[in-house]
């Protein structure tokens, strides 16, 4: 680990030299690339500097303890040494997490897909709740959310919503949300006060660039039709809705939120590209898992990952046995209280696999 840290520190010094070169300012694209790389490894270099400083203090205190004869002073040095060892261990664990393998998709934007599962109208209402939660979380992180497609129900719910989430670190944070989200609450239509359980599925796909996934236009079938609202009624007098079918994979994407056929097609292709990239990466992960004879990655996406219990104001994430009695705050967008421990957990898992 320490060889890697020395290498990172050396690279950091080289990047600082590059950034101080006035000629680099003439090439803004290269300057931004180097500045971004410099900012990414700066926390590692800072933590490594702290680690080395603590080690020097530990050696100094150990030498002073050997030389000291006064019992009270010796006890003070022992306490100082114990505290320094604790700080060194914490800093070393933090450095291990920082050096854990990084997901190559972490810097990408996101295609977020939320769909109602079991539970009928109640599940559709919870799709609306979850989308509102993610939208508020995005606002707190200054990300941009753009609805690509949605299908409303008659009482304000959503059968499905697909949105693009653009912003720094969007995939690195939201990737932990994919899976089945279960809700337990008394529906508005329930006269007996009984708690119902419904389920919603969340898919989080890294947005694919054209260089990531090439789509041959000959592999596409594009159909246009009139967009429809709740209940199936037509909401447009022109054929602006677009259905794109990728013939080799059988994937189908429908977009009808825009009044322009051209814009709907562009959005549909964005979603299709993300789904194809996700499919390719899932197949690759499955091959690796078969080779290792164990599941690799963040686990089966179809499993229940979280339960939202409204009567108890409780949210439980089953992957890390985390329970918080602040459901109202979480639904208000305070998702970092769940995502931070999830991120730490999966980083530690990735590091263990590397070792």
Swiss-Prot record:
Keywords: Cytoplasm, Methylation, Protein biosynthesis. GO terms for cellular component: cytoplasm. The modification N5-methylglutamine is found at residue 233. SUPFAM superfamilies: Release factor. Its main location: cytoplasm. It comes from the Bacteria. The keyword Kinase does not apply. Belongs to the prokaryotic/mitochondrial release factor family. NCBIfam families: prfA, PRK00591.1. Peptide chain release factor 1 directs the termination of translation in response to the peptide chain termination codons UAG and UAA. HAMAP family: Rel_fac_1. This is Peptide chain release factor 1. It comes from Syntrophobacter fumaroxidans (strain DSM 10017 / MPOB).
